[in-house]
């Protein structure tokens, strides 16, 4: 009995365990239907256009990512290698290579133009000497801080692109006008002309060295001085003596140099001349033979005459633009003051007019002493005969007489000049002065 009961009890336990296993089993799930042979249903509704498709990673995308990372590593290694090589390379070699690259971009030859207007950081409008204007590019290696309207720039000869800036935009012709070395002539080399020397000292030299004298007197120093008189009376010589005596910058120009070929170059040179004078103040501007550009104005159909008149108008403008106490003085010289325009020599522009007449007996004696001081003269030489003569000899004629007498003595292998040499030299000088050069010189 006990065995049977125990047997029945064992079966009951097995049945309970089976029921637990059935309860633990998962529910039946239907298999995913196959899409093969079935059309994809089109998504309907407004939200379908904004939904992104589901993207699942693939092995091919992973390979592309690994390849891109490897390429990036190689590029970083190459960049590091180049940086190391640049660091090891001497600085001078790097600079030479950079200059060579810039020169290659610039090209040769380079044209010079004027910057008219800056459009933006990369474009500008430039003009050339011919007068045409161009809309051009500005190269990246050009210093943008130095660019300003009106400055001189370097242009490529093909596309006129701006490839550089001229730091010193001074006209080369104006730079040549500036005397780097003072002339050797002094006031002692000027025979006579004591009154003229005193007047030019008061008008030019003293305002530059002692301007306080004029302030105490309550007057304004003259702006400009004009020297006029017959040829050979010492106008240019006195201007050289002024340049030697003062420590001011001396700018010398001949009036014919202001007449240029292209339209507008003459007035531009006048502006450059006075701009350089103001930058190097105190300075003296000496314009010799001013009658080349300062003649009286009249109606003319010639383009050259109109350009000369424009140059003179720019000169008048520059004379009016000076400060009354400025450290720039204007010195002019001419042989024909009657042909000058009245607007040029009126008070306010040219305040003092100094006349240089033909030398008198006292001045002739002084000039002869200056030019014969180093010559060996014979005992029979009497210079008073030439001094008291009524011949209209200028200072340049007397100098030519002394030089010609010395040449005649050298022709005869003599180191002493005789009275006969002076007489022959006087005849030659007077003949060339009155009759001109002999025709035999041109045969």
Curated annotation (Swiss-Prot):
For this chain, one GO molecular function annotation is: ubiquitin protein ligase binding
Provide one Gene Ontology biological process annotation. negative regulation of gene expression
Q: Where is the composition biased (Basic and acidic residues)?
A: 12-29
Keyword annotations: ATP-binding, Cytoplasm, Nucleotide-binding, Nucleus, Proteasome
> Where in or outside the cell is it found?
Cytoplasm; Nucleus
Q: Which PROSITE patterns match?
A: AAA (PS00674)
Report the gene knockout effect. Answer: RNAi-mediated knockdown at the L1 larval stage, causes 20 percent increase in mei-1 protein levels.
Please give the residue ranges the record annotates as the region Disordered.
1-53
Alphabetized Pfam families for the sequence: AAA, AAA_lid_3, Prot_ATP_ID_OB_C
- Binding-site positions, ATP: 229-236
Q: Which GO terms describe its cellular component?
A: cytoplasm; nucleus; proteasome regulatory particle, base subcomplex
The organism's superkingdom is given as Eukaryota
| Major site of localization recorded for this protein | cytoplasm
Q: Which InterPro entries match?
A: 26S_Proteasome_ATPase (IPR050221), AAA+_ATPase (IPR003593), AAA_lid_3 (IPR041569), ATPase_AAA_core (IPR003959), ATPase_AAA_CS (IPR003960), NA-bd_OB-fold (IPR012340), P-loop_NTPase (IPR027417), Prot_ATP_ID_OB_2nd (IPR032501)
User: Is-annotated flag, keyword Thylakoid?
Assistant: no
Under the heading SUPFAM superfamilies, the entry gives: P-loop containing nucleoside triphosphate hydrolases
> Do you know which PANTHER family this protein is assigned to?
26S PROTEASOME REGULATORY SUBUNIT (PTHR23073)
Please report which protein family the annotation says this sequence is part of: Belongs to the AAA ATPase family.
Entry function:
The 26S proteasome is involved in the ATP-dependent degradation of ubiquitinated proteins. The regulatory (or ATPase) complex confers ATP dependency and substrate specificity to the 26S complex. May play a role in the degradation of microtubule severing protein mei-1.
Q: Write the protein's name.
A: Probable 26S proteasome regulatory subunit 4
Q: Which organism is it from?
A: Caenorhabditis elegans
């Amino acid at each position: 009995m006990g065995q049977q009961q125990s047997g029945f009890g064992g079966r009951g336990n097995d049945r309970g365990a089976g029921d637990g296993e059935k309860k633990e089993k998962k529910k039946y799930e239907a298999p995913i239907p196959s899409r093969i042979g079935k059309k994809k249903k089109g998504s309907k509704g407004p939200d379908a256009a904004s939904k992104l498709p589901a993207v699942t990673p693939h092995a091919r995308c992973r390979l592309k990512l690994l390849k891109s990372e490897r390429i990036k590593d190689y590029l970083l290694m190459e960049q590091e290698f180049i940086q190391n090589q640049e660091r090891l390379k001497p600085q001078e070699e790097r600079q030479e290579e950079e200059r060579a690259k810039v020169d290659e971009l610039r090209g040769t030859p380079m044209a010079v133009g004027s910057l008219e207007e800056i459009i933006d950081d990369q474009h500008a409008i430039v003009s050339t000497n011919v007068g045409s204007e161009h809309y051009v590019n500005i190269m990246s290696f050009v210093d943008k801080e130095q660019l300003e309207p009106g400055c001189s720039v370097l242009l490529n000869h093909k596309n006129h692109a701006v490839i550089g800036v001229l730091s010193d935009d001074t006209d080369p012709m104006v730079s040549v006008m500036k005397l780097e070395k003072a002339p050797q002539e002094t006031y002692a080399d000027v025979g006579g002309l004591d009154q003229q020397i005193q007047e030019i000292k008061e008008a030019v030299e003293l305002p530059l060295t002692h301007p306080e004298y004029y302030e105490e007197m309550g007057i304004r120093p003259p702006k400009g001085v004009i020297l006029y008189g017959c040829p050979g009376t010492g106008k240019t010589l006195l201007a050289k003596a002024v340049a030697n005596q003062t420590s001011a910058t001396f700018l010398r120009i001949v009036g014919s140099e202001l007449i240029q070929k292209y339209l507008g170059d003459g007035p531009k040179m006048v502006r450059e001349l006075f701009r350089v004078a103001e930058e190097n103040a105190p300075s003296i501007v000496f314009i010799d033979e001013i009658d080349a550009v300062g003649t009286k104005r009249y109606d003319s159909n010639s383009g050259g005459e109109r350009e000369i008149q424009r140059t003179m108008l720019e000169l008048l403008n520059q004379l009016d633009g000076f400060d009354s106490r400025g450290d720039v003085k204007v010195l002019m010289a001419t042989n024909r003051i009657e042909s000058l325009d009245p607007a040029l020599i009126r008070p306010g522009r040219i305040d003092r007019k100094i006349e240089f007449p033909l030398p008198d007996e006292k001045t002739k004696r002084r000039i002869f002493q200056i030019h014969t001081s180093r010559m060996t003269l014979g005992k029979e030489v009497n210079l008073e005969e030439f001094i008291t003569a009524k011949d209209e000899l200028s200072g340049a004629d007397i100098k030519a007489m002394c030089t010609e007498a010395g040449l005649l003595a050298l022709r005869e292998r003599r180191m002493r000049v005789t009275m006969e040499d002076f007489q022959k030299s006087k005849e030659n000088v007077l003949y060339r002065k009155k009759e001109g050069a002999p025709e035999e010189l041109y045969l």
